[in-house]
């Protein structure tokens, strides 16, 4: 028999702002076998539930709590019975399950991150069951659904590291008594892309295709044409160009947030050794680093 404390006294000086609980980093590898041709999705999933009462906080009464171990088991079972066509669809399946199965669950938040496995391929021939880990951008999604509404779906790319050795500069910036940074017309530009976007609705969206399209736009606007590149006068301009092209080509996207750290590579001074280093040997610096962010959304008139 469950016991809980009944010595609660109302406190008029504090109130709840938000509550939630759940299970983080539930890892599964789902294998879809079509004869000898196998497809895989490996994911790490985190689930947060909000209940319609707070008796577990106020009284220590656990009678409404769905154990986090049950949440973990549910994620695994849904992977078995629903499969993982896309991580966004999988996250929506999790939201739908908890809202339809438990009347006292009023909000579900799901974060899913996909491990970047890529099928072995040689001369256009794809291997039937072998994959290689390719860290060229991690696909993640965040889905939140209230009992009274549709799911709100975000997808994103993170840990996409890119570098170019020229076609970037930084000039004309504000200078004061503390400025020591020289203007530069030509420099290395390196960053690790974090890009997250929101869908205006989740019906009839090919989430995998949209993710690949955004990733392609990021690479296109960063690198430019393969034979000559594209000049970047600032990290801010490159960030904005990615957003504008993404929203112009992908009508399913409502808004987009991007964060770009400016990862520095500095020329090593070899003059004390009697050598002139012409930007051939650079020193990578992990920190400190600049970080540039920006979020854009469609204007109301653009939706009409």
UniProtKB/Swiss-Prot annotation:
InterPro entries referenced in this protein's UniProt entry, alphabetically: Uricase, Uricase_CS
Its keywords, alphabetically, are: Acetylation, Oxidoreductase, Peroxisome, Phosphoprotein, Purine metabolism
- Biological processes, Gene Ontology terms: purine nucleobase catabolic process; urate catabolic process
Pathway listed for it is:
Purine metabolism; urate degradation; (S)-allantoin from urate: step 1/3
Record's subunit section: Homotetramer.
Q: Which residues carry this modification: Phosphotyrosine?
A: 289
Q: What PROSITE patterns does the entry give? A: URICASE (PS00366)
The record's CDD domains line, in alphabetical order, gives: Uricase (cd00445)
Q: Where does urate bind?
A: 68-69, 170, 187, 235-236, 262
Family stated for the protein in its record: Belongs to the uricase family.
Name the chain's protein: Uricase
Which PANTHER family has this protein been placed in? URICASE
